[in-house]
Amino acid sequence: MEGEREGVVAKNEDNAGGGGGGLGTGGNGGGGGGGSANGRRRWRGGGSSGYRQHPIIQAYPALLPLPINGATGHAHINGAVSLPLPLPPPVLLYLQPPPPPPLLPLLPKVAAATFYGKPPKAADAAPRGSMWKHRPSKKPPPHAITAALLPLPRDGKALQEKIFFANERKTSEKEVNHVDTHEKFTVAPLDNAIARRPDMGGVEGAEIPLSANHFLVQFDPGQKIFHYNVDISPRPSKETARMIKKKLVEENPSVLSGSQPAFDGRKNLYSPVRFQEDRVEFFVSLPVALARCSVVKEDTGHMLDKQKLKTFKVNVRLVSKLCGEDLNKYLNEDKDGIPLPQDYLHALDVVLREGAMESSILVGRSLYARSMGEARDIGGGAVGLRGFFQRLRPTKQGLALNVDLSLSAFHESTGIISYLQKRCDFLKDLPQKKTRALAEEEHREVEKALKNIRVFVCHRETNQRYHVHSLTKETTENLKFRDRSGKDLMVVDYFKEHYNHDIQFRNLPCLQIGRSKPCYVPMELCVVCEGQKFLGKLSDEQTSKILKMGCERPSERKGIIKGVVKGAFHARSDTYADQFSLQVSKHMTKLSGRVLLPPKLKLGSSGRIKDITPDRFDRQWSFLDSHVAEGSKIKSWALISFGGTPEQHFCITKFVNQLSNRCEQLGILLNKKTIISPIFERIQLLNNVGILEGKLKKIQEAASGNLQLLICVMERRHQGYADLKRIAETSIGVVTQCCLYSNLSKLTSQFLTNLALKINAKLGGCNIALYSSFPCQIPRIFLSEEPVMFMGADVTHPHPLDDSSPSVVAVVASMNWPSANKYISRMRSQTHRKEIIEQLDVMAGELLEEFLKEVGKLPSRIIFFRDGVSETQFYKVLKEEMHAVRTTCSRYPGYKPLITFIVVQKRHHTRLFHRERNGSSSHYSDQNIPPGTVVDTVITHPREFDFYLCSHWGTKGTSRPTHYHVLWDENNFRSDEVQQLIHNLCYTFARCTRPVSLVPPAYYAHLAAYRGRLYLERSDTTMYRVSPLQTVPLPKLRDNVKRLMFYC
């Protein structure tokens, strides 16, 4: 192409000569860059380009595309500066070479230019800077052109190839030259823009030998996998689909070329060899029980007959050929831009669990089987089941299989009457009261409990399964249906006549199991099918019981995991793995971790600063003889009691006195007297939102509108807690602190201390601070005079059975520097189950404004912690949410802070264990790894910047380290620096006297998002449904609350 010249990369930093020109104007190549004897002078264009004087272009002449006369407007570069046009498409981005190494620190990771204005030959001129939104009549859409550069290599070496993108797809240089000038034309970076690991890993801390539940997998890069699509009609259940696949393989060995294909139970079949034909149709017949199921179907008036055999048509079609070479390149080649072959990885995952699927229930990536232990009753019609999780992961050591113990709640397989007796408290006496009917509210609760559950009838043998869609409005006794002759029949009479069965629970409704036509089944004749995951919200008691099932000490968990891999808990066969040339190691991965030292903490003591180092094994510290770092002043507060006995009420005066005394000892000024005498109400008040709000308003009025704190003492946990928090924080404007009477009966020093610390944090105080500020800890990055803001973000979604409620997002940000231990939040509701934060730019803008008011200047750096993102969403989250933060920052002229974007993951299955030395077990083998343990080798990503950090001491079960993945890093952290930063932050969580497992910005965001969820859920008496397309906004916080850590 005319005007194209090669640039030159200087070989020596200290003697950098001038580089070649970029792409010039009007077809002429840009001139060479000016030389520099010492590498300090800026790169300057020496050619005739009209744009050479712009600093961005001086730094990077390759940013300029090839201009063609005809377009007007301006180019907006990096969201900050503009260039005058003509600069029309087609755009060609020249990626080779990057600038000399001395300039690398001066440039952003990605330079981007968006061109605005009037496209060539457009009929009318668009307004200046209008994104080319003008559309000529009956012509293709106008231009919206973006140019972006690849992230610069850290070594400063030139990229090895030119890459051209046109019309949002990779293309050739020749095709670029012939792009229609009215088509959208984009020059974009490669997908792999995730930050690379900056070094070989950290070195700080004492070494500790560990093992991880990752098992190395050897695979043959030359092994092809043939992916077939499977279409079965009529659509079978998952269990039936597996039976069909098994019989299909048994009956057609020659057609399938003798292979034993792996099946995911839905649509995908994977074979190590190609079938005889790429498209083939089979007919598979399965035996079905002769008995007729007892289901009354309206308009037929007879039982649904079942045939001896049911025939399924199976269409198998070749979709693609997958090869292991791409995965081998991804694992072993140190290059950016190599995509992870997800299809091949998924195929291998299916292959490795195929053997276990024959005797297990698959839920997500976990398999549950009786061989892992009997189901345990956890109450409420649910049982807890043990299983195992397995997933292939690309790691530094190669492909590894992550195997872990898994727990989940399932519906108990029992009769519907018995199930409802356990599930619904108001039906506990149902077997003794067979004539009992359901009130309107009870009918809704029972329907909610049974909806979508699979059942089978029990008075006769049948393998037919049904989904419960709803309940009949009429009771069984009054329910009629019309037979084929048009005669109305009573359901009760029908079952007596045809099955000699007297319906016992006549005043209960029938189950409606037909979607299109009404099909009725009496409740007492139905049984809940086994193996159904419990999707409803677990109660606190159920959650506690299922967590206890998973509280194995490290040695026990390690033994279970080893047993799974060796096949002790399922009939695992290596047949499938052998066919696909896979070999899974039976040994856990051995590696070395490092234990980081705890930071020195700052407390108060009689008005002086006191430092302590948490040197206990669990890194806990005490406030004995110490003050909080900064105590709040609470002059106006009140107490209200909900429920409780007269004896418990008598304890309130003692509680108020001891709490105020403990606060005084901690340096917190809590008025020894409440503004009004304690108020005692029945707990039923929490059921009535209107009366509750009126009562709280009266308390606020008694304080002349200046009530700072309301302590709420409850007889027990109550669903009205959500209404209480919502009313207090959004309507009344007061911070609340709830506690239970059961704790007041003891009034231990630990309880009073914890309560005082929470109150202090909520009312603007500061409990703990680092003795050495962040600029002292990481002087290469942080400066005292350049403030830094730590941000955290999380999105919470409604429980799985809720198909309409909005998701809730929370963003928090630190408001002080250099302590960085006070955070405020912003919350929003957004589209149902959407993970990307929709209004991040608005919330970030509000937080920046608050930071500016508190600190006096905008932060020069932003460290953003994003919780709750899966690996498949990394690129989308980085692209959209980083853009939102950048957009917010660009509203301040000339403001461009350096941003580091880190994803925080707790929901993973990597576990770290003490490793026995010389094959002998040590006294550490049954202990959790110590707080501060960090791992950034062997089991981490082959190239990207991630690590595991266990910052807390696990008191129960086996510790789960937190996985931190740096997606974007403009601050150029080294491994040791970012690990030390996060580790030390974990000691500053406001309501704990020990380090927490999650970095506080992410932890606070999680708490704030949960609070927003409470605002929507409310108590059952005030719940409402919305359409999936409607997003109910969260109620607005009162001004005197939203600047506090009320959610803590």
Curated annotation (Swiss-Prot):
It comes from Oryza sativa subsp. japonica (Rice). Residues 422-530 form the PAZ domain. The gene is AGO7. One of its GO terms (biological process) is regulatory ncRNA-mediated gene silencing. Residues 1-50, 121-141 are annotated as: Disordered. This is Protein argonaute 7. Residues 16-37 have a biased composition (Gly residues). Involved in the RNA silencing pathway. May bind to short RNAs such as microRNAs (miRNAs) or short interfering RNAs (siRNAs), and represses the translation of mRNAs which are complementary to them. Regulates shoot apical meristem (SAM) initiation and maintenance and leaf polarization through the trans-acting siRNAS (ta-siRNAs) pathway which probably modulates the expression of the ARF2, ARF3, ARF4, ARF14 and ARF15 genes. Expressed in the reproductive shoot apex. It comes from the Eukaryota. GO terms for cellular component: cytoplasm; nucleus. Residues 709-1017 form the Piwi domain. Residues 1-14 have a biased composition (Basic and acidic residues). It holds the Pfam family ArgoL1.
